[in-house]
């Protein structure tokens, strides 16, 4: 059985991003105790921009040394469009998540947010990216595993007002994944990530000054959380998403990214001493099986 090496590599990049997002959950929770959602999002986004522009300068400087005629910004107009559209989607999804996350349990919040694992294949039909039977089955298996991990024995599926915001968040994240799928093959991954976070930072800053009154002391209190989320969760993990989604089916990408829930649970188990029941471990196993099943090449009919 011959696996697609590029697909496997890109899936592993997305899994690494999901690992960073999963372990960043504690940092986000701590940071939210000091500053409002828009302040936290603005601070981490500007920090991500600072981190990414250094990478852009280093990479483009090296490329222009080899060929002085190479433009600094690759496909500038498309980069502007992609950065704005992806940034708006990321800002809206992150804001909806932050607003809704305080209204329900962590388990239900994790489940509702990660529902993009089934929304992406559905949106793919409208974007001309039909997932196929195998990937559709794998997405459903991943959803079943997500339910066992997050909700089995804990919550009902009755939704409150804030939980509808989390459902909206999952739809917006699905759109963001599809937008990255559209733009990433045509653009430099690091440059697109910078443009995306620049748009997110500008929008977050506007909303911060309209709806919140942050102080320097508050931001200082959340500094460690902002640094972790800004550099690793935003600067590194979302860049891994953009690079990893190149030439990868968005359904596989969504399954890899929703492994964030598994890594978050495992981090709590290993680092914080939290317990995982047999049902929750079975959910983790199902989600891992779905990811591995998605890597198996389909038989080509002659």
Give a label for each model feature.
Residues 51-56, 116-137, 262-281:
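C-terminal transmembrane-helix exit sites in multi-pass transporters
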Residues 18, 43, 109-115, 179-201, ...:
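Helix-helix packing/entry segments at the starts of transmembrane helices
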Residues 3, 45, 56, 60-61, ...:
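C-terminal-most transmembrane helix of multi-pass membrane proteins
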Residues 31, 40, 44, 100, ...:
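Hydrophobic/aromatic residues within transmembrane alpha-helices
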Residues 8-13, 39-58, 80-81, 135-144, ...:
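Hydrophobic alpha-helical transmembrane segments of multi-pass integral membrane proteins
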Residues 52, 131-152, 170-173, 204, ...:
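Hydrophobic transmembrane alpha-helices of multi-pass small-molecule transport proteins
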Residues 1-43, 87-88, 92, 96, ...:
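Glycine-/small-residue-enriched transmembrane alpha-helix faces in small-molecule transporters
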Residues 20, 24-25, 53, 59-113, ...:
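Specific transmembrane alpha-helical segments of multi-pass solute transporters/efflux pumps
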């Amino acid at each position: 059985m011959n696996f697609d090496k590029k697909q496997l590599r890109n899936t592993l990049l997305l899994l690494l991003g999901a690992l960073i997002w999963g372990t960043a959950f504690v940092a986000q929770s701590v940071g939210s105790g000091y500053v409002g959602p828009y302040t936290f999002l603005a601070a981490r986004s500007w920090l991500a921009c600072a981190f990414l522009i250094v990478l852009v300068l280093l990479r483009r400087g090296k490329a222009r040394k080899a060929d002085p005629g190479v433009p600094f910004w690759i496909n500038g107009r498309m980069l502007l469009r992609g950065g704005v559209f992806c940034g708006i989607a990321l800002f809206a999804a992150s804001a909806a998540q932050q607003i809704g996350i305080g209204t329900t349990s962590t388990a239900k919040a994790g489940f509702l947010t990660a529902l993009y694992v089934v929304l992406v294949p559905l949106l793919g039909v409208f974007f001309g990216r039909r997932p196929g039977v195998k990937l559709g089955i794998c997405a459903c298996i991943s959803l079943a595993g997500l339910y066992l991990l997050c909700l089995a024995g804990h919550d009902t599926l009755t939704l409150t007002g804030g939980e509808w915001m989390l459902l909206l968040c999952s739809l917006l994240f699905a759109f963001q994944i599809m937008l990255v799928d559209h733009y990433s093959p045509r653009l430099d991954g690091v440059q697109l990530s910078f443009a995306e976070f620049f748009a997110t930072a500008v929008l977050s800053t506007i909303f911060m000054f309209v709806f919140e009154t942050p102080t320097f002391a508050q931001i200082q209190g959340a500094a460690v959380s902002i640094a972790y989320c800004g550099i690793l969760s935003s600067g590194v993990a979302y860049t891994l998403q953009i690079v990893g989604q190149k030439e990868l089916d968005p359904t596989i990408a969504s399954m890899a990214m929703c492994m964030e829930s598994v890594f978050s649970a495992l981090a709590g188990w290993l680092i914080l001493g939290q317990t995982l029941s047999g049902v929750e471990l079975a959910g983790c196993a199902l989600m891992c099986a779905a990811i591995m099943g998605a890597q198996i090449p389909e038989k080509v009919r002659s």
